[in-house]
Swiss-Prot record:
Annotated segments matching region Disordered: 1-22
Biological role stated in the UniProt entry: Component of the 26S proteasome, a multiprotein complex involved in the ATP-dependent degradation of ubiquitinated proteins. This complex plays a key role in the maintenance of protein homeostasis by removing misfolded or damaged proteins, which could impair cellular functions, and by removing proteins whose functions are no longer required. Therefore, the proteasome participates in numerous cellular processes, including cell cycle progression, apoptosis, or DNA damage repair.
GO cellular component: P-body; proteasome accessory complex; proteasome complex; proteasome regulatory particle, base subcomplex
Lineage: Eukaryota, Metazoa, Chordata, Craniata, Vertebrata
Bias (Basic and acidic residues) ranges: 8-22
Name of this protein: 26S proteasome regulatory subunit 7
Sequence intervals crossing the membrane: none
Species: Rattus norvegicus
GO molecular function terms noted in the UniProt entry: ATP binding; ATP hydrolysis activity; general transcription initiation factor binding; proteasome-activating activity; TBP-class protein binding
Amino acid sequence: MPDYLGADQRKTKEDEKDDKPIRALDEGDIALLKTYGQSTYSRQIKQVEDDIQQLLKKINELTGIKESDTGLAPPALWDLAADKQTLQSEQPLQVARCTKIINADSEDPKYIINVKQFAKFVVDLSDQVAPTDIEEGMRVGVDRNKYQIHIPLPPKIDPTVTMMQVEEKPDVTYSDVGGCKEQIEKLREVVETPLLHPERFVNLGIEPPKGVLLFGPPGTGKTLCARAVANRTDACFIPVIGSELVQKYVGEGARMVRELFEMARTKKACLIFFDEIDAIGGARFDDGAGGDNEVQRTMLELINQLDGFDPRGNIKVLMATNRPDTLDPALMRPGRLDRKIEFSLPDLEGRTHIFKIHARSMSVERDIRFELLARLCPNSTGAEIRSVCTEAGMFAIRARRKIATEKDFLEAVNKVIKSYAKFSATPRYMTYN
């Protein structure tokens, strides 16, 4: 029979004699092996996880969720008397509107409420509501039996308008904006100084400017500056795109603008940023077809909210556009937009600063001549310089390197600035600004 294993793979009796006996691991060796690969806090973390599992098990046992098919607590835990008392004390209310207050200064005032599509009633207040909480025109909650006023309700605002409010501040700061030093100073005078030092304006007897128009070619940092302002102030920030206010049905856009400012007045201080305002703020004209009538109604409502019969309050308004020549003169007048800030192309110092800002978060070699790169990018916007830095990183990735070199930046300048010049609309937009 042929030996398929071979002599080198087959054990002999002499080899078996030389083999050492296999010793079983004791408990100490097993405990030592278990500690391999564990961090300093592994034991504490495991202990906390076990405690959490025990608490969850105890909670489920008390509520009886696992034992019940319906997910209800077991009947032994029911409190029917307390549930009935809760139902009697907390009954569903009907929404109405208080249209007038009769004998408001007396001890027993009466309130005229209007229940929509039903009737009008003269009612009293319940014991839980103070007379100072109710005002004329306010939405209130009334019971279905005596129609007494139980709670005051906040104003009705469209959920689409409420969702425009930004809860988290943008992560852009003034140090992330390059080539706009003068523009940032003008913005801070209008937005930050009235909020932080209002006594300066009171002593002089003037009202601070409340509206700013940011205009300039695309990519010069208008929206970036607005995000930096929102990061610096503690005011509520509401960004609005102009095209969001262009609605299909008549009156919808004007209603959204009205509710937007109504929500802003409820805040202590508010900053509203209208981006691409030329979508609704164009000059009025009659084309004969009436296609732009709804857009013009939206703009008229915006004009009224900016400087109309009702005071604007502590609301700052920023607007950004690439085409200031198309805006309506009524929107541009002082009192509505007090300050116009032009964002022009950055100079040599600004372009160098923009290169350093974008290279700050990149892995680049030392001693890159950013001023030389800035000289090779004349008449370039901040967005184009950012594209140069991104392309330099792509060249480094293509060459399988971990850092970007100056040669990568030079090749990126040739690709973005020189090759893409035919796609640039900056010269055409410079004639509009």
